[in-house]
UniProtKB/Swiss-Prot annotation:
Gene3D superfamilies: 2,3-Dihydroxybiphenyl 1,2-Dioxygenase, domain 1. The lineage of its organism: Eukaryota, Viridiplantae, Streptophyta, Embryophyta, Tracheophyta. It comes from Arabidopsis thaliana. Zn(2+) binds at H91, E142, H160, E208. InterPro entries: Glyas_Bleomycin-R_OHBP_Dase (IPR029068), Glyas_Fos-R_dOase_dom (IPR004360), Glyoxalase_1 (IPR004361), Glyoxalase_1_CS (IPR018146), VOC (IPR037523). This is Probable lactoylglutathione lyase, chloroplastic. It comes from the Eukaryota. Belongs to the glyoxalase I family. Residues 1-61 form a transit peptide. Keywords: Chloroplast, Lyase, Metal-binding, Plastid, Repeat, Transit peptide, Zinc. It is found in: Plastid, Chloroplast stroma. The active site is at E208 (proton donor/acceptor).
Length: 350
């Protein structure tokens, strides 16, 4: 950006930025000559008449303003594109210590279906996809088992997953019967009427059970803790194109939540951001991995993420071997997300 030096009221002073690229006017030489010949008019020092100096300064101002306008246009264009992009939360990825045990718990206690499973022996890991409907239209779970690793640190930053069920009490009884852990018995949420309960899976991941009627997305929430809620909301609105659905402050318990997503909570999965008063950083552990989101253009997505404060950890482009285009990033709190090309994602499922 061109730097504009303010003009003095008593004289016309050209910006040194206008001359700094010219070998004829190195700044050190100008300073030395100025000190030796202060009695010479400035217009003669630079070999320019006053009206030419004025025109040069005005041109510099014009360049700066044009640059600002172009930047503003780029921001506006990207904001509009992000808002119009066809985005959907595809799956949430995390690591488990015993794949078979976890699949058994999710299918028998939580009513999920095993959608597909793949083993990658050359890279020593296995993936399993579970959920309440096909991957091309539902938010699902992607479990990762790394050979020989049976335990992970969940950390303090990850909160819980949310699952909508018809009858919370009945689900809790089933969890107990299967040897699962219940960390909060069924009952109304504090300050509200919705019946909830909290359970833990065999690896210690927490699940909030929410009593709701029939919903197209039973796997309905991912809760993450953030150190600056306003910053996080702005980032997810601008860079991810999410909508702020609602906020709720709980001064009695010293925390605030914000629900972000691509549609209403009762029909779409949401990201629940939680801010605990006075806590600005969290240990994220090594268990929770990321959320995957569909996009029509991973390249433009990466541009928007960079522009609005995110960090790209994998530049946009195809994955080796399968040609699926992705880009990966960190939000301002360090939570990872991966954007996947919509068409490529559907091809993977064929």
């Amino acid at each position: 950006m061109v730097r504009i030096i303010p003009m003095a009221a008593s004289s016309i002073r050209p910006s040194l930025a206008c001359f700094s690229d010219s070998p004829r006017f190195p700044i050190s030489l100008l300073s030395r000559n100025l000190s030796r010949t202060l009695h010479v008019p400035q217009s003669q020092l630079f070999g320019l008449t006053s009206h030419k100096l004025l025109r040069r300064s005005v041109n510099c101002l014009g360049v700066a303003e044009s640059g600002k306008a172009a930047q503003a246009t780029t921001q506006d264009d990207l904001l509009t594109w992000v808002k119009n992009d066809k985005r959907r939360m595809l799956h949430v990825v995390y690591r488990v210590g015993d794949m078979d045990r976890t699949i058994k718990f999710y299918t028998e206690c939580l009513g999920m279906k095993l959608l597909r499973k793949r083993d990658i022996p050359e890279e020593k890991y296995t993936n399993a996809f579970l959920g309440y409907g096909p991957e091309d239209s539902h938010f699902v779970i992607e479990l990762t088992y790394n050979y020989g690793v049976d335990k992970y640190d969940i950390g303090a930053g990850f909160g819980h997953f949310g699952i909508a069920v018809d009858d919370v009490a009945k689900t809790v009884e089933l969890v107990k019967a299967k040897g699962g852990k219940v960390s909060r018995e069924p009952g109304p949420v504090k300050g509200g009427k919705t019946v909830i309960a909290f359970i833990e899976d065999p690896d210690g991941y927490k699940f909030e059970l929410l009593e709701r009627g029939p919903t197209p997305e039973p796997l309905c929430q991912v809760m993450l803790r953030v150190g600056d809620l306003d910053r996080a909301i702005k980032f997810y609105e601008k860079a991810f194109g999410m909508e702020l659905l609602r906020t709720r402050d709980n001064p009695e318990y010293k925390y605030t939540i914000a629900m972000m997503g691509y549609g209403p909570e009762d029909k779409f999965p949401v990201l629940e951001l939680t801010y605990n008063y006075g806590v600005t950083e969290y240990d994220k552990g090594n268990a929770y991995a990321q959320i995957a989101i569909g996009t029509d253009d991973v390249y433009k997505t990466a541009e928007a993420i960079k522009l609005f404060g995110g960090k790209i950890t994998r530049e946009p482009g195809p994955l080796p071997g399968i040609s699926t285009k992705i880009t990966a990033c960190l939000d301002p709190d360090g939570w990872k997300s991966v954007f996947v090309d919509n068409i490529d994602f559907l091809k993977e499922l064929e």
